[in-house]
């Protein structure tokens, strides 16, 4: 056990985590030159295409250092703010972390937030300055930034390049010398933390765990403590590039377990595994459930696919512990699910994974956050509102509270004005402004979560020419003046387009919604009024003009009354049509409402 090291890699997006992980795997000969390819651990097509890490990946390396063999378990983590729960899970399974900072971009908001996570878990931090071979690299200045942040010595910082492989040997040496070996006792009852799970269609659920105490043997009967279910360990082993079956995995090591579990609900990430005969009494603590930030409805395009969609969602949930969903129905879209996501990127990715991995085409409704509504009858008891249609009527409503966040934005000094302008437009209140260096400024805002859900991230990048980085943490609920904006098509409300909006933005957003829908809804044989309403008050309107057939074309010359008769008849037909006609809303219309500023 003294020769095991568990570590993870933390960094901001695009600071080169996955590339450096590739180099470490190459240097320890975990992968042969033939198997090597870029982003080796990112095994989802989506991850490769977007060049981001979505899932944490575990892999075991063997390395000989000063004549002694060591086992290094690397857990690669995502850098995007939406996936910070993946990072927190990986951190719980490690003793040390490589903090990677890009020599050209310096420290970013995400680097700091992940670093705090690691420090809370008492991890040993090894600072690595990556991409030192770039022409735009500025190692001296960035080293000073790292020293200010960590309080380490200049000689502690390892210079490296994921591209050329420079400095990789030094990193491996530092991992072995600085990161403490796992503490644990082989003699005690089995206690292992589940930090990930995958669904394999042939073998059921693969559980990935880290043993804290005791050991797990092949064929042993094990128990999941959260659910109390017992299974036989049909196959256990370690994770190299492919799985390597073993007969026993002892304290301190990371491995996988296959026991033919088919039900997604049986395996909870963060649960403790133990021996069924002599179970441990205490679960591994310090692991909290992730709270979804953004809610949206997901509906099958064809209502017959509802059950299939449920199965797909359950399988996705296995692999992505942060996805939460509950059944709901909508008058406009039929049966579907209300899903909770970590953020907009997460929502997009779930939608793409449903389409790719399960061939499901789905309709997504306008995303919103979770509100607390208080009625006049019970002004002390708040009801949770995840769906705008659940909001009580305005006459019964006392007040609505919405979640606020503390946003940390790090940007270049030139763009401070632009960034502040954007945040104030989004109802943010500045709480702090610090100059980290003469060039870089950290801004802190308190702002409503609902405002950053839509397009905040994209617009922040635009106003700062791509330089600003952003991170947020929730700070609780605050009372706000919110109204429910309904969209009426042909005088009937479309529940899937309803949204909860701050009073000050309501007119502006209502008008834009109507204009956007006018462009996207195809013309019919009759006029379609599109209206935005708050309660009974209409605040904006657009009309989609009717397509008209020329009924008088067959008359030439002759009496005007003949033509009039035909026109009157057409008018009656249109009137009847408007009463019974229903308007189909294309999928683009639901999505376009999200991007009102384009």
UniProtKB/Swiss-Prot annotation:
Q: Where in the cell is it found?
A: Cell inner membrane
UniProt-recorded Gene Ontology molecular function terms: GTP binding; GTPase activity; ribosome binding; translation elongation factor activity
Q: Which GO terms describe its cellular component?
A: plasma membrane
Entry-linked PROSITE patterns = G_TR_2 (PS51722)
The disulfide bridges present are: none
A GO BP term here is: positive regulation of translation
The tr-type G domain extends over: 2-183
- Keyword annotations of the record: Cell inner membrane, Cell membrane, GTP-binding, Hydrolase, Membrane, Nucleotide-binding, Protein biosynthesis
Q: Which reaction does it catalyse?
A: GTP + H2O = GDP + phosphate + H(+)
EC identifiers of the protein:
3.6.5.n1
Query: Organism's domain of life?
Result: Bacteria
Per the record, membrane topology reads: Peripheral membrane protein
Binding positions for GTP? 14-19, 130-133
| Task of the protein | Required for accurate and efficient protein synthesis under certain stress conditions. May act as a fidelity factor of the translation reaction, by catalyzing a one-codon backward translocation of tRNAs on improperly translocated ribosomes. Back-translocation proceeds from a post-translocation (POST) complex to a pre-translocation (PRE) complex, thus giving elongation factor G a second chance to translocate the tRNAs correctly. Binds to ribosomes in a GTP-dependent manner.
What NCBIfam families does the record tag this protein with?
A: lepA (TIGR01393), small_GTP (TIGR00231)
State the family it belongs to: Belongs to the TRAFAC class translation factor GTPase superfamily. Classic translation factor GTPase family. LepA subfamily.
Query: What's the protein called, per UniProt?
Result: Elongation factor 4
Species name: Flavobacterium psychrophilum (strain ATCC 49511 / DSM 21280 / CIP 103535 / JIP02/86)
List the top taxonomic levels of the source: Bacteria, Pseudomonadati, Bacteroidota, Flavobacteriia, Flavobacteriales
């Amino acid at each position: 056990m003294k020769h095991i090291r568990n570590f993870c890699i933390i960094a901001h997006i695009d600071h080169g985590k996955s590339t450096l992980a590739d180099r470490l795997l190459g240097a320890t000969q975990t992968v042969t030159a033939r198997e090597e390819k870029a982003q080796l651990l990112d095994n989802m097509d989506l991850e490769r295409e977007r060049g981001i890490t979505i899932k944490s990946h575990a892999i075991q390396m063997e390395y000989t250092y000063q004549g002694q063999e060591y086992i290094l378990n690397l857990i690669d983590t995502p850098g995007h703010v939406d996936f910070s729960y993946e990072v927190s899970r990986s951190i719980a399974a490690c003793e040390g972390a490589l903090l990677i900072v890009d020599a050209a971009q310096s420290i970013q908001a995400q680097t700091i937030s992940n670093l705090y996570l690691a420090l809370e878990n008492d991890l040993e931090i090894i600072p690595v300055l990556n991409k030192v071979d770039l022409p735009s690299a500025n190692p001296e200045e960035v080293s000073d930034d790292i020293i200010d942040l960590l309080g380490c010595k200049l000689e502690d910082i390892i210079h490296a390049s994921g591209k050329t492989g420079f400095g990789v040997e030094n990193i491996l040496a530092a991992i072995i010398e600085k990161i403490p070996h796992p503490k644990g006792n082989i003699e005690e009852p089995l206690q292992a933390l589940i930090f990930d799970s995958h669904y394999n269609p042939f073998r059921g659920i693969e559980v990935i765990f880290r043993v804290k105490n005791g050991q797990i043997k092949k064929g042993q009967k094990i128990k999941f403590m959260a659910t109390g279910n017992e299974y036989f360990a049909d196959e256990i082993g370690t994770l190299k590039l492919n799985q390597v079956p073993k007969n026993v995995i002892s304290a301190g090591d990371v491995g996988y377990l296959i026991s033919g579990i088919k039900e997604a609900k049986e395996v909870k990430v963060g649960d403790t595994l133990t021996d069924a005969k002599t179970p441990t009494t205490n679960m591994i603590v310090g692991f909290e459930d992730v709270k979804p930030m953004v809610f949206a409805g997901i509906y099958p395009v064809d209502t017959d696919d509802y059950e299939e969609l449920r199965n797909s969602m359950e399988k996705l949930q296995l692999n992505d512990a942060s996805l939460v969903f509950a059944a709901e129905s909508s008058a406009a879209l039929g049966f579907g699910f209300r899903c909770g996501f970590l953020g907009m990127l997460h929502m997009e990715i779930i939608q793409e994974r449903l389409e790719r991995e399960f061939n499901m085409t789905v309709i997504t409704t306008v995303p919103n956050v979770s509100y607390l509504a208080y009625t006049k009858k019970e002004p002390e008891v708040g009801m949770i509102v995840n769906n705008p249609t659940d909001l009580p009527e305005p006459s019964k409503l006392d007040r609505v509270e919405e979640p606020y966040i503390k946003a940390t934005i790090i940007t270049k000094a030139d763009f401070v004005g632009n960034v502040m302008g954007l945040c104030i437009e989004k109802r943010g209140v500045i709480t702090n402004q610090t100059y980290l260096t003469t060039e870089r400024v950290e801004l802190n805002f308190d702002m409503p979560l609902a405002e950053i859900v839509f397009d905040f991230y994209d617009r922040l990048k635009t106003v700062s020419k791509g330089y600003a980085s952003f991170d947020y943490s929730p700070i609780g609920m605050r009372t706000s003046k919110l109204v429910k904006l309904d969209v009426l098509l042909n005088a009937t409300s479309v529940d899937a387009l309803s949204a909860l909006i701050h009073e000050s933005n309501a007119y502006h957003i209502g008008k834009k919604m109507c204009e956007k829908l006018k462009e996207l809804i195809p013309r019919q044989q009759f006029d379609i009024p599109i209206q935005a309403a708050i309660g009974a008050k209409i605040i904006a309107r657009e009309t989609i003009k009717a397509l008209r057939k020329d009924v008088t074309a067959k008359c030439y010359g002759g009496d005007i009354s003949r033509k009039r008769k035909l026109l009157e008849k057409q008018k009656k037909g249109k009137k009847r049509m408007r009463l019974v006609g229903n308007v189909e809303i294309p999928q683009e219309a639901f999505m376009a409402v999200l991007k009102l500023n384009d």
